[in-house]
Amino acid sequence: MADQVKERTLEETSTWAVAVVCFVLLFISIVLEHSIHKIGTWFKKKHKQALFEALEKVKAELMLLGFISLLLTIGQTPISNICISQKVASTMHPCSAAEEAKKYGKKDAGKKDDGDGDKPGRRLLLELAESYIHRRSLATKGYDKCAEKGKVAFVSAYGIHQLHIFIFVLAVVHVVYCIVTYAFGKIKMRTWKSWEEETKTIEYQYSNDPERFRFARDTSFGRRHLNFWSKTRVTLWIVCFFRQFFGSVTKVDYLALRHGFIMAHFAPGNESRFDFRKYIQRSLEKDFKTVVEISPVIWFVAVLFLLTNSYGLRSYLWLPFIPLVVILIVGTKLEVIITKLGLRIQEKGDVVRGAPVVQPGDDLFWFGKPRFILFLIHLVLFTNAFQLAFFAWSTYEFNLNNCFHESTADVVIRLVVGAVVQILCSYVTLPLYALVTQMGSKMKPTVFNDRVATALKKWHHTAKNETKHGRHSGSNTPFSSRPTTPTHGSSPIHLLHNFNNRSVENYPSSPSPRYSGHGHHEHQFWDPESQHQEAETSTHHSLAHESSEPVLASVELPPIRTSKSLRDFSFKK
């Protein structure tokens, strides 16, 4: 009979067939590995450290998939040999009993086999289906050991094989989906470049002259947000809900939030020198590393989604709408935060001087954590990717008409809602998130570019080693006079917030122009986006001082007194 036909082993297989399969698998694997390595090299060459770290996360996900694949392959036979009763196995199926009987030739649950009532055609169909499944299974002997005991396998060998494919499809679709969303969001944010360049024009500086006094409601930012609907919570959320669909990020909002960020974190006079758009791009690249990763919490959510595919739960009516509802709430919340920033301006007074200054703060965000919004966006992207991956996998395995898609409406709902969520994430929520989350109480480490950040980390690491080994003196003499400490060019003291407010008495008289006259005013803020040529000029200038007057040049580094002073500066990820 057909169900007694067993698959051939390697002893019965041609060696050339085995060699061809191994060659193809190795060739594809080597090409993929080499491609990933080339992409990583390109990211390093372009100084895209955040994207390189995101690529490392993708490689970690691929390694995790390799472990899952190995475990499924090894545990396929032991798992399929676990037997459970037919009563337990008949619960929570994707198909109804009638659908299973029609599709697989199984009798309805609860009916006993009387031997005469079963139609010969149905019996033949059952035998054909079972033999087909056994032929396609991996590492099976072609028969079900549990059937001999009158029981059912916990998960059949072929079922594990199908699950194996789905997990791989889910991971790949999630990564691709995140990349597409990030790319579309970057395209949407290209318009910000012209806004950023406008801040360096004379017209912008004149219109925002600090000597000008205006009513808060008469400013462009005030006219957009200070209205009657912003006085009550209900009308505020309703208006912000619809506002996200029509110009979620406007020029007025961008310029106001940019000005507030710079005034909160930098010394006055640096507004035209700081590139806020590039800072947002670096922050978004770093957040992309988190989004592209499938964390244990996200894997747990995937398991819950698999559980909801039981017949009777009708998951197709509510599961696709979860990411849609969440992303709409997140977008509304981000719009509400912008409006509340405007209301804070009015609370300080009806008259503003120059450009309106918004006051950032973590209290504007849920639970006082701006990163919580990133988690919700991560959850939305994964949920939507899960819907797409599950649809593609189930269609490939069981055709379009299957138990997971009970009707055409199910397919339409999944695809339409998935497309809507994709558009909202890319063109509405992601640009809003990138801008509004900068309004927290603290600025992110990405305020420095990769070159400056690397110098800061090296300086901090060297300073910690000096303190740890007790190589500094207890006086105010700076430790930088020692040859192993960072030089003037790598000292980050002039990068720190409120540096201009520190007492100049801690720094003895120095020939450096930074602490005298016009030079001090000009270099009070080291522009992270300065050109490489300027950095080289500064480096050569400091080397000249070190060669001629090493003692005086070393005075420009901050002193290290105790380990507590080191904790005042940290560069954590």
Swiss-Prot record:
Cellular component, GO, one term: plasma membrane
Biased composition (Basic and acidic residues): 522-548
Transmembrane segments: 16-36, 62-82, 165-185, 288-308, 318-338, 372-392, 416-436
Ranges of Polar residues composition bias in the record: 473-490, 498-513
Keyword Kinase (UniProt): no
Positions of region (Calmodulin-binding): 450-471
UniProt keyword Ubl conjugation, yes or no: no
Alphabetical GO biological process terms: defense response to fungus; negative regulation of defense response; response to fungus
Lipid bilayer topology: Multi-pass membrane protein
Protein name per UniProt: MLO-like protein 2
Source organism: Arabidopsis thaliana
Name of the gene: MLO2
